[in-house]
């Protein structure tokens, strides 16, 4: 007589995919030898009666290094702007993640997808627009950090990524320095003499400002040129310019007092820019002219 049975698999386990064929049939033949004995033999021969093949796998996980490794951007010399600086994470020289800072200096890197357990060693650095490390008045920080990521199989079909800075450093910090290049301004005037020809160095003129005093003379063409002033900080600088009264008989000296106001601004790209405005009393003038 032949007996046929159906064997099924049931149950679930995290991360395990059961055999798509959930049922197996197996038959046994029972034989009577007419001598009081029964024998049983599986229909189909020797070997395993049946096999269920299940598959264990893990789901990929996305993880950003900066979720666990605090990365901070600092800028001295001016305010930091959101998205101003870029940071790269490299593995074997290839960029695998990048990101920027926010206005507070916090850096967020893009996530990396991990599909299997393992260990990854990364280099974290700031990206610089050129090899000099200097761009638009900003000196970039060339510091690099090593990040070691360990991806573990939790045994339930999931992966966990753990990111740690190598060494004793608790966080990755990058400090850039902003400094605008100085600018120079030339302040000059014109001397006009009526009644006779003007002579070189005939008249003297004084410029006075905060911690500044300079006296020069005219050239033969009437030009008056003070030394150039250099500025390394933004601000407003005010000077008064007047003619020094001489004692030549028959000469009427100009008693006018002019004001030169120099406004120095930082363009935010590493440059100081200056503009000069002239005034006589409370009236704006195009330039300074002394008439004798």
Question: What residue ranges belong to the model's regions?
Answer:
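Solvent-exposed loop/turn and edge beta-strand elements of beta-rich ligand-binding domains
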Residues: 1-292
């Amino acid at each position: 007589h032949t007996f046929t049975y159906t064997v099924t698999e049931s149950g679930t386990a995290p991360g395990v995919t059961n055999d798509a064929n959930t049922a197996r049939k197996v038959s046994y033949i029972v034989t009577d030898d007419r001598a009081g004995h029964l024998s049983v033999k599986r229909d189909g021969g020797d070997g395993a009666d049946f096999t269920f093949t299940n598959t264990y796998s893990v789901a990929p996980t996305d993880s950003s290094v900066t979720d666990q490794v605090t990365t901070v951007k600092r800028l001295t010399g001016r305010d930091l702007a959101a998205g101003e600086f870029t940071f790269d994470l490299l593995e074997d020289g290839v960029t695998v993640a990048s990101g920027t800072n926010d206005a507070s200096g916090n850096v967020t890197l893009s996530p990396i997808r991990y599909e299997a357990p393992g260990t990854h060693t990364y280099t974290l650095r700031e990206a610089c627009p050129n090899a000099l490390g200097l761009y638009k008045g900003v000196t970039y920080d060339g510091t690099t950090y090593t990040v070691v990521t360990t991806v573990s199989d939790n045994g339930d079909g999931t992966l966990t990524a753990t990111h740690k800075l190598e060494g004793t450093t608790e966080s990755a910090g990058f400090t850039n320095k902003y400094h605008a290049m100085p600018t120079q301004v030339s302040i000059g005037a014109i001397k006009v003499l009526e009644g006779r020809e003007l002579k070189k160095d005939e008249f003297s003129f004084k410029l006075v400002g905060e911690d500044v005093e300079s006296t020069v003379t005219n050239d033969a063409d009437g030009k008056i040129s003070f030394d150039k002033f250099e500025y390394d900080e933004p601000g407003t600088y005010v000077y008064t310019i007047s003619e020094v009264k001489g004692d030549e008989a028959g000469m009427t000296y100009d008693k006018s007092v002019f004001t030169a106001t120099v406004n120095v601004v930082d363009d935010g790209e590493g440059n100081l820019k200056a503009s000069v405005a002239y005034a006589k009393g409370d009236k704006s003038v195009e330039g300074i002219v002394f008439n004798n």
